[in-house]
């Protein structure tokens, strides 16, 4: 007998479990088991990972799950490039997680209100890791508040120093867009992503990829959270990979199905192609804004293609209200928590999603027209 509603699980069962109704896909269904296996396989393939984990909630849930799993009672180092890597500090302090935490902040290369920011110099980072020998190093691949990206060579240098000190390297890739990070090449041990930016899907979880070293290490760790127990969610994924299913908390089954479908769409189109499109779109938008006299917060060499953050003296632009009148939703500027000063004022543009990437001319033209009206 087929499922009651054909658009939910046409080849499924009549729903009498204590978990779902007929209007949602059951986590025990053959259909959803395939969804989880597909998500795992895609994450492992794209990020060159040993293991994949889905943690319900969102990217921040994943950050906290990782912090509580690997950072509890440990010596931690954070590379802070803005507000959303300051989030690591907020998580640490709220949960009293590490035994100690050191922060290396991004900084301006030279004094000046509108001078660009660069991450902490890599030599300083390596020297600090060598001296402190942290158990875990946390960094943002792309920092959403400043539009900074850490290049692969920077990541590799951090990873090498961290591994030499016996530590794990955690990289927040939630805002990376389709600039996929190769964990094998860069040395990243724990990578955190989410569906709603680079994966062009609905927010519903964190997507976490583990290196072989992290997969080995996690077995000797103990989380301090029940709902955000990373090791438990890893076990759930491994149950699905083994052809079965398991339950810890309720997974967002329908949203994860949508994510799987988009993953398949991107795979068919080409992971390398969307990566190239992301870079081209970012470069083109940054050039357009520069022509209009808008200065980038991110210094040359660290300019993210998926998030563009520019200085402004216009409160209407900083809040995004002027762009609302043009039919565009941008993001308001936020502090960096990097000693930027009280007069720091920016606006932020996100360049995420297949619909932007596949239509670069249209995407840029929409922005160009709107800025021509408000500047």
Regions found by a protein language model. Give the residues of each.
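Active-site phosphate-binding strand-loop segment of PLP-dependent enzymes
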Residues: 111-173, 177
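Conserved N-terminal alpha-helix of the aminotransferase class I/II PLP-enzyme fold
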Residues: 17-62, 91
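Conserved beta-loop-alpha segment that forms the PLP phosphate-binding cup at the N-terminus of a helix
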Residues: 50-77, 81-89
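Active-site C-terminal subdomain of aminotransferase-like
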Residues: 196-287, 355
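Internal helical hairpin/lid segments
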Residues: 75-78, 251-321
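Conserved C-terminal alpha-helix-loop-beta "cap" of PLP-dependent enzymes
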Residues: 290-351, 355-362
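Conserved active-site segment immediately N-terminal to the catalytic lysine
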Residues: 184-196
